Amino acid sequence: MIKSKNITILGTGISGLGSAKLANKLGLNVFVSDNNIIGEKIKKYLNENKIDFEENGHDIRRLLSADQVIISPGISFVDLKKRYPEINKEKFISEIEFASRFTNAYLIAVTGSNGKTTTASLIYHILKSSGFNVGLAGNIGVSFAESVCNFSYDFYGLEVS
């Protein structure tokens, strides 16, 4: 489980938004930060759910005061560290690590250069056709965190980078 209450999420793509939804559902204090402009649909969701956010940059004070920082896969920790040398790597986790703390499902994660989507989909279909309660998530449409937020599966086929 998670020891912290103050969660900062970097990025508002599929992974970041899914993490925000899960953290919010868990009753954590969520702050979302994006280096770019946040789309209106996402802003609407964040506002409706009373999730604080910032766009066009990351406030170093938020990074330092967070108990845990969930970093989207498209954000380089190395680049963040160069820009903000005072940040602590120990606080940073991926969306996959975050979501995995809140499910008891078996995870079958597929990574590599080629064939990830096909392999993850095949795993899902084999398990599903065998009668298992299985979900398919990751870089395949729905984020793992959002799936954990909305469903309870016994197995996951995950496409990860």
Question: What feature does the model see in each segment?
Answer:
Residues 1-94, 98:
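N-terminal leader/targeting and accessory segments in enzymes
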Residues 5, 25, 60-64, 73, ...:
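Phosphate-binding loop of NTP-binding sites
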